[in-house]
Each structure stands twice: as structure tokens, then as C-alpha cells.
């Protein structure tokens, strides 16, 4: 069996060294020393000013909305994981969808201003597959209309735009450290901001809104993460370069094998680095996608229709709206297996099946 993804695990002894320390200290959670160390190490690795390690990427988005005091409409993308939209609704705000760019698959920055109303308070955009949005144009729009900007950077660990971490754009960026991600802490998330006052507010929100032994400053949540999760994050961090290099090598193997596939790749931001978080292909038709997926399934090779269906037309708690580009792309995009342990021989096998179905 070849899964669509498989978590990277460090050598067991490296993880257990951290676990021995947890056992000795008996400090399991509540901003323990490993969680604090992970925050410091990640700030250095990612070259960001301020960062918090939290429960997961979804809670990170919810905390970001809360910290920025957003209560109205939030312009967002219908082509993302459901947590992007559900977090908006969970916080009592209204998502306003804007169609995506057919090349980058990120929110189309040229269409954002048409969606702005007197109720608009923020833009929440996703760096799809780690491919950065048009962060410069979005920043210009936000300044012009006095809007907050949150980036769902769940896929964008390690990516840089114009030599700067993609996490440093917007008021807040959030990242997922779920085990399916290229860098993970089993479960986990990050909140990144350049604003020290906002960081202080987010830290309080993460800890139930507590500001001292006997006082509260915010409406808070339990957004903390445990020492066990921090241990996995620390153990994995030293392997990130090897993980990146291997995923790049495997992606290039796909490129070589699939040069005659009736499909196109995502057009990457011209000023951004790649982290090879996913290998998506946009096939020429949904019919071809379904045939390929069915044959791969029969051979126990599992792919993912990521993201399908469109969030704007599929969520039971929102009015259904169809956006032509999102509807089209979501029906034709397929993510192929990509993970550290995948071999080039397995990729050759996957690609032979794909091309056989296409050419028959």
C-alpha cells in the first residue's frame, strides 16, 4: 500500500531523550521547558520575531480572529481546508468568498476589492499547498480599506517571499504542525506576529485569558500544547533540511515521469521559495481524474482530492454559492503521494499507472 502521506518520525532514541526529561521533571504541560525551547528554536529557524506554540492550526486561526477583535465580515477563499472557513463562523463572523486565481490557486487579489462592504473587517487568505498569495497586493488593499490580514499558512512552513519568511506578512500568520505536514509535532500549531502587544494578547488568550495569578485580561481558551508534542517538534526540527531535500528530489522525479500527462502544475509565486509540501496536478478533466483515482485505488495507491468540494458550495451552515474557477479546479485537482519514505521506484510505478489510464 502507498498512502497519500505518511508522517516523518525521527530516530526513536532522539525522541526518547526528551521523554526521559519529561519523566524526570514531571512537568507535562502548561508552557513547560520543552514548549518554550521549541518556540525559541522555531523563531531562530524560521527567522521570525514572535511566535507561539499552540494546540493546533484551527485553534490558531480562531485565536487570531479573537485577538484582532474581528466581529464582522471576513473575505476569504473557498479553496482551502474546511477549518479556514469554519473558524470564521465559529468566532461569530461572516465569511465572504472570493474566487481563486486559476494559476496559483490562491485567492485572486484582483477580485478582493469588489467584495469589500461597510461590514468587512479582515482578509483571511490561504497559502495553498505552501504557494504564497499575492501578499504585496493584499497588504496594499488592507491598508487602503483599513482591514486586518490573517494568513492561513498551514502548508507554508519554511517558505520565504522576497527573502523574508512568509509568516512575517499580514497581522497574524497561522501554521499547522499536524502529523500530515512536512514538519510536525504530532498535533500542534503556530501563531506568528510582528506586533509585541498582539503577541502578549495572544499569549493570554492561549491560557484562558489569564494575565496574572488572580486576574484575567481577555476572553481566553485552552490553546496550550504539551511537553510530549513539543518533544516531537524538537526531535523533528533537526531533520527539516533532509526532509525538504528528499521531498524536492521526489517532486522532481514526478516531474520527469509526468511530463506527458494531460495536466498542469500550480504556478508558483515568482519571488518565493518552495517547500514541496504537496504534489498537486490539475488534470484536463474530472473524468480523467476519476479514472486515474479509481485505478490507483485498485492498486492500493491512495491520492487525495485536495481541496474538493468547494467550501462555498458544500457547507451545510452557509448559503451555497458557486465560483466558476474554484468549482472547476476543485473537480480536477489531485494530490499524489508524497512523503519522506516514498521511493523513486514507487513513483515510477504510480506514474506508469497514471499514464496507462490516460493513454488507453
Tell me the role of every PLM-derived stretch.
Residues 1-28, 337:
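N-terminal "arm"/small-domain region of PLP-dependent enzymes with the aminotransferase-like
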Residues 27, 31-73, 79, 87-90, ...:
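Phosphate-binding glycine-rich loop
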Residues 33-41, 45-51, 110, 114, ...:
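PLP-dependent aminotransferase class I/II
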Residues 52, 75, 96, 149-150, ...:
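Structural detector of well-ordered beta-strand residues that form the stable sheet scaffold
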Residues 66-153, 160:
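PLP-dependent aminotransferase-like
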Residues 103-104, 130, 181, 284, ...:
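Glycine-/small-residue-rich active-site loops that bind phosphorylated ligands and cofactors
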Residues 151-185, 212-217:
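Conserved active-site segment immediately N-terminal to the catalytic lysine
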Residues 168-204, 227:
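Active-site PLP attachment segment
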Amino acid at each position: 500500500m502507498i498512502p497519500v502521506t505518511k508522517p516523518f518520525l525521527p530516530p526513536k532514541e532522539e525522541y526518547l531523550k526528551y521523554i526521559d526529561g519529561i519523566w524526570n521533571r514531571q512537568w507535562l504541560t502548561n508552557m513547560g521547558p520543552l514548549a518554550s525551547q521549541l518556540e525559541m528554536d522555531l523563531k531562530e529557524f524560521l527567522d521570525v520575531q514572535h511566535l507561539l506554540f499552540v494546540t493546533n492550526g484551527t485553534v490558531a486561526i480562531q485565536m487570531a480572529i479573537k485577538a484582532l477583535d474581528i466581529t464582522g465580515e471576513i473575505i476569504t477563499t473557498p479553496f482551502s481546508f474546511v477549518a479556514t472557513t469554519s473558524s470564521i463562523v465559529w468566532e461569530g463572523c461572516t465569511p465572504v468568498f472570493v474566487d481563486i486565481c486559476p494559476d496559483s490557486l490562491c485567492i485572486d487579489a484582483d477580485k478582493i476589492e469588489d467584495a469589500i462592504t461597510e461590514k468587512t473587517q479582515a482578509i483571511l487568505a490561504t497559502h495553498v499547498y505552501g504557494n504564497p498569495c499575492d501578499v504585496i497586493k493584499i497588504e496594499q488593499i488592507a491598508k487602503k480599506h483599513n482591514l486586518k490580514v490573517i494568513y492561513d499558512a498551514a502548508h507554508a512552513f519554511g517558505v520565504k517571499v522576497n527573502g523574508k519568511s512568509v509568516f512575517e506578512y499580514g497581522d497574524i500568520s497561522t501554521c499547522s504542525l499536524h502529523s500530515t505536514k512536512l514538519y510536525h509535532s504530532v498535533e500542534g500549531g503556530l501563531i506568528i506576529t510582528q506586533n509585541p502587544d498582539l503577541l502578549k494578547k495572544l499569549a493570554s488568550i492561549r491560557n484562558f485569558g489569564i494575565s496574572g495569578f488572580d486576574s484575567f485580561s481577555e476572553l481566553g481558551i485552552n490553546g496550550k500544547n504539551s511537553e510530549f508534542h513539543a518533544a516531537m517538534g524538537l526531535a523533528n526540527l533537526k531533520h527539516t533540511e533532509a526532509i525538504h531535500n528528499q521531498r524536492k528530489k521526489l517532486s522532481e522525479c514526478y516531474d520527469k515521469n509526468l511530463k506527458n500527462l494531460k495536466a498542469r502544475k500550480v504556478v508558483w509565486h515568482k519571488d518565493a521559495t518552495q517547500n514541496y509540501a504537496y504534489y498537486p496536478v490539475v488534470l484536463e478533466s474530472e473524468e480523467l481524474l476519476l479514472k486515474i483515482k479509481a485505478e490507483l485505488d485498485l492498486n492500493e495507491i491512495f491520492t487525495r482530492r485536495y481541496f474538493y468540494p468547494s467550501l462555498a458550495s458544500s457547507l451545510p451552515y452557509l448559503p451555497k454559492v458557486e465560483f466558476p474557477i474554484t468549482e472547476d479546479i476543485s473537480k480536477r485537482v489531485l494530490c499524489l503521494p508524497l512523503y519522506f519514505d516514498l521511493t523513486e521506484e514507487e513513483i515510477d510505478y504510480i506514474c506508469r499507472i497514471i499514464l496507462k489510464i490516460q493513454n488507453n
